[in-house]
Design a protein with these regions (language model features):
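Peripheral, non-catalytic segments flanking oxidoreductase cores
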Residues: 1-238
């Protein structure tokens, strides 16, 4: 399998306090009937449209690289008008001397359940990814770049060809870190199963079929660090 994080150079709201060392702002997908609030809504909608387009372009290239009969088959999940995608802003305040060591973990080890994540941050380090041997490496920050993180759903769609990237956020700087993630997800009733082109006699179906709604319910019933895609793996095949 391939575990991948790509760095790219580029050109309603609910506030949830998850812990004293991380705060986040969630923005749900755009709904026409929701009142749009001036410059903020315009800026967010423009940003979401841009990163959504970027994500779809990347997934189309993935489809071409995998020689899928329809290179848009994965990106169509995100283009769907009922896509469950959303935008999140994370704020990691710099720790103070009295904070316990556990506060150095801004967000614990996990993989994202969605298809992929488009991440951008300021110039403060903190993002780390887990290598196949279990070691952790820091991802150098670059505020002029987007980072593309493979999620569990893409792992299932590609029958394990691409693997969800386990990552975490470390609060180790004397400066505040901020990041923005666009989580690209299918509609709740979108049916996820290994694409036929990714299945062969030597690589049988390795994941059970599920809807995105079913996966969300199963995934969020487990602890953050749990390998949640394992719930749908066919162990004899993967």
């Amino acid at each position: 399998g391939t575990s991948l994080i790509i760095k790219l150079k580029i050109k309603k709201i609910k506030v949830i306090i998850l812990s004293v060392w991380r705060e986040c702002l969630l923005c749900s997908r755009y709904c026409e009937h929701v009142l749009q609030i001036g410059p903020y809504s315009n800026a967010v909608n423009t940003y979401v449209n841009d990163v959504k387009g970027l994500a779809c372009e990347i997934l189309d290239l993935v489809g071409e690289g995998l020689r899928l009969p329809d290179s848009h088959v994965i990106s169509d999940f995100i283009r769907h008008d009922q896509s469950d995608s959303f935008l999140r802003f994370n704020y990691y305040p710099a720790p103070v001397d009295r904070d316990p060591p556990s506060y150095r973990i801004g967000f614990g080890e996990h993989s994202d359940p969605q298809i992929l994540t488009v991440l951008r941050s300021n110039d403060v380090p903190g993002l780390e990814i887990c290598l196949p041997d279990g070691s952790w490496v820091a991802v150098p920050p670059d505020p002029s770049a987007y980072y593309i993180i493979i999620g569990d759903t893409l792992e299932a769609l590609t029958n394990g060809r691409f693997r969800g990237v386990r990552h975490r956020a470390i609060v180790s700087s004397e400066r505040t870190r901020m990041s923005t993630m666009y989580f690209c997800a299918p509609p709740l009733d979108g049916r996820i199963s290994p694409l036929p082109a990714m299945v062969s006699e030597s690589k049988p179906v390795g994941y059970s079929s599920f809807t995105w709604g079913e996966y969300k319910r199963a995934a969020y019933s487990k602890r953050l660090g749990h390998n949640r895609i394992d719930l749908f793996k066919i162990t004899s095949a993967v």
